A protein has these predicted regions:
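Short, small-residue-biased leader/transition segments that mark boundaries at the very start
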Residues: 1-6
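Conserved phosphate- and dinucleotide-binding cores of soluble alpha/beta proteins
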Residues: 10-177
Length: 177
C-alpha cells in the first residue's frame, strides 16, 4: 500500500492551503495511508534535538521521510518565507543583504546555490535529497524564478513543476550567466 508522510511547518493562516491539508486530501483520494509530522520550525536546536531523541512518533515519521522513494516539495521566496516564519525584521534584512533569494526545507539559498541560513528543522534538509529516489520541486510564478533557480543550484532536483512565466525567467537568468 502507498504511504505518504506529510511534513509541514504550518506556515500561514489559511489552513485549506497548507501542505498538510493538501497532502492529507491527496493521500485519501489515492487510497494511501498517511502520517503527519507536526514540529514547528521555530523551536530551538536544543528542544528539536530533545523531541527527536525522546518522541518515538516524531522519530519514526522522520525515518520514513528520509527513506522516501519520491519527494514532492515546495520552493519559496526567501523574503516571503522569512516573514511567514516570523523572523525578526532586522534578521530578514541581513538575510536578504547576504543574498538569500530562495528557500526550501527552512534553508535559505543565494542565486548561485550557496546556503545562507538554515532554520532548525525536523525532517529533511537539502543535503538529504541525494538519498531520495526522485525529487520533485514545485513552484510557480515569475516572482519565484530566482528562488527556484537558487534551490536547483543548491540541491538535486530531478523534476521541476512550474509555470511558463517562471520557466521563461529561469531560462533568461541562465542565458545571462
Amino acid at each position: 500500500q502507498r504511504q505518504m508522510c506529510i511534513r509541514d511547518s504550518g506556515l500561514g493562516d489559511n489552513v485549506e492551503l497548507q501542505a498538510n491539508t493538501i497532502a492529507t486530501v491527496l493521500a485519501q483520494r489515492l487510497g494511501a495511508s498517511y502520517r503527519q509530522l507536526y514540529v514547528p520550525d521555530s523551536v530551538s536546536e536544543e528542544i528539536l534535538n530533545s523531541i527527536l531523541a525522546e518522541d518515538i512518533g516524531v522519530k519514526s515519521v522522520v525515518d520514513i521521510i528520509k527513506q522516501a522513494d519520491i519527494l514532492v516539495h515546495g520552493v519559496g521566496q526567501a523574503s516571503v518565507m522569512a516573514r511567514h516564519r516570523r523572523l525578526p525584521p532586522e534578521f530578514i534584512k541581513k538575510l536578504l543583504d547576504d543574498g538569500a533569494v530562495g528557500e526550501a526545507f527552512g534553508q535559505y539559498c543565494a542565486l548561485d546555490g550557496r546556503q545562507i541560513y538554515m532554520t532548525n528543522n525536523a525532517g529533511l534538509m537539502l543535503q538529504d535529497l541525494p538519498k531520495i529516489g526522485t525529487v520533485i520541486g514545485v513552484a510557480g510564478g515569475r516572482s519565484k524564478a530566482a528562488a527556484i533557480l537558487s534551490v536547483i543550484r543548491a540541491s538535486r532536483q530531478d523534476i521541476l513543476i512550474t509555470d511558463e512565466a517562471a520557466a521563461h525567467d529561469i531560462v533568461r537568468m541562465l542565458e545571462n550567466d
